[in-house]
């Protein structure tokens, strides 16, 4: 596995992490790279756009059907999609039952033991990042993923999740080789979003790898179960994903040990950028509205 790059995309649920990762990986394969995607999100939507299909059967689902994971063959769980990209979904239990992270651990061990990592240039883990619990931290903790890319936006909860993920990376950075590759901002058109993303990246001792502009063509492609790279290869949005892929490809060995900030520092930063308002500002705005209404 010499030369194998193991990267991971982390981010809060609903941030567009799976869409961003699949579009980026589709652009990477166009650079001549051989890729294996390991979906580590219980929604099992990490490979849908690459396979042009509904969510594929997961390792945990198939293992339960066959009796145990030892009863499976790699061919049972691995599907091949756009330009030869290999796809696996680890899956998770029913909501409220058991640890979804266990599926991640089971899947990665099974794939490694059965040669799925042979003959690929990249293994990409697509990981839920609202919580960095034991199972979801597994690609970091077990030194599987060496480069972590955090997908975020200018929204407060996305920034909060990004900082939390940085804490998880820091915890294992010194015992293993894991590093923060950078932040990817998926534009939500919030106030001063680019400035805020760059400021957070700097505070985390990292950099903003790419700012992905919002474009409805992403949704149009998703409705057809396709990446933008496949659906509209000549579009400006496809060019954005190619630029992101180029930056990740050139980023080998450039990752950093992150420096997460406190909740107070995060809130101060949001206040500085005018994203979060002080009680005094909110009261002044309310009084101004009431005065304007009274004057009518």
UniProtKB/Swiss-Prot annotation:
Could you tell me the keywords of this UniProt record?
A: 4Fe-4S, ADP-ribosylation, ATP-binding, Iron, Iron-sulfur, Metal-binding, Nitrogen fixation, Nucleotide-binding, Oxidoreductase, Plasmid
Pfam families the record matches: Fer4_NifH
Q: Which BP terms from GO are recorded?
A: nitrogen fixation
Posttranslational modification: The reversible ADP-ribosylation of Arg-102 inactivates the nitrogenase reductase and regulates nitrogenase activity.
Give the matching SUPFAM superfamilies: P-loop containing nucleoside triphosphate hydrolases
Per its UniProt entry, which superkingdom is the organism in? Bacteria
Query: Which residues of this UniProt protein bind [4Fe-4S] cluster?
Result: 99, 133
Q: How is the cofactor bound?
A: Binds 1 [4Fe-4S] cluster per dimer.
The reaction(s) annotated as catalysed by this protein in its Swiss-Prot or TrEMBL entry are:
N2 + 8 reduced [2Fe-2S]-[ferredoxin] + 16 ATP + 16 H2O = H2 + 8 oxidized [2Fe-2S]-[ferredoxin] + 2 NH4(+) + 16 ADP + 16 phosphate + 6 H(+)
Q: Where does ATP bind?
A: 11-18
What cofactor requirement does the entry state? Answer: [4Fe-4S] cluster
**EC number(s) reported in the record:** 1.18.6.1
Q: What class of enzyme is it?
A: oxidoreductase
Provide any one GO MF term from the record. Answer: metal ion binding
UniProt xrefs under NCBIfam families: nifH
Subunit description:
Homodimer.
What function is annotated for this protein? The key enzymatic reactions in nitrogen fixation are catalyzed by the nitrogenase complex, which has 2 components: the iron protein and the molybdenum-iron protein.
Q: Which HAMAP family match?
A: NifH
Provide the protein name. Answer: Nitrogenase iron protein
Which source organism does the UniProt entry give? Sinorhizobium fredii (strain NBRC 101917 / NGR234)
């Amino acid at each position: 596995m010499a030369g194998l790059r193991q990267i991971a995309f982390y981010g809060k649920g609903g941030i567009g992490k799976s869409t961003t990762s699949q579009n980026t990986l589709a652009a990477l394969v166009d650079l001549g790279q051989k890729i294996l995607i390991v979906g580590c999100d219980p929604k099992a939507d990490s490979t849908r756009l690459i396979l042009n299909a509904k969510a594929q059967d997961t390792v945990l689902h198939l293992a339960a059907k066959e009796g145990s994971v030892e009863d499976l063959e790699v061919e049972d769980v691995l599907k091949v999609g756009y330009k030869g990209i290999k796809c696996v979904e680890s899956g998770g239990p029913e909501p409220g039952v058991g640890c979804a992270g266990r599926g991640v651990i089971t899947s990665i061990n099974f794939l490694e033991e059965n040669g799925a990592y042979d003959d690929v240039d990249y293994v990409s883990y697509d990981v839920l990042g609202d919580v960095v619990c034991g199972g979801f931290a597994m690609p970091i903790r077990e030194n599987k993923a060496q480069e972590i890319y955090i997908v975020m936006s200018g929204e407060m909860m996305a920034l909060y999740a990004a900082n939390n993920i940085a804490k998880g990376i820091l915890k294992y950075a010194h015992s293993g080789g894991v590093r923060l590759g950078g932040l990817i901002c998926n534009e939500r058109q919030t106030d001063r979003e680019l400035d805020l993303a760059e400021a957070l990246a700097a505070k985390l001792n990292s950099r903003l790898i790419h700012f992905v502009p919002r474009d409805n063509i992403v949704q149009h492609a998703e409705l057809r179960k396709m990446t933008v790279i496949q659906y509209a290869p000549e579009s400006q949005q496809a060019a954005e994903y190619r630029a992101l892929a180029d930056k990740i490809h050139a980023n080998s060995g450039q990752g950093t040990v992150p420096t997460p900030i406190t909740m107070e520092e995060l809130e101060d930063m949001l206040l500085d950028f005018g994203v979060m308002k002080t009680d005094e500002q909110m009261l002044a705005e309310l009084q101004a509205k009431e005065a304007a209404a009274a004057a009518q």
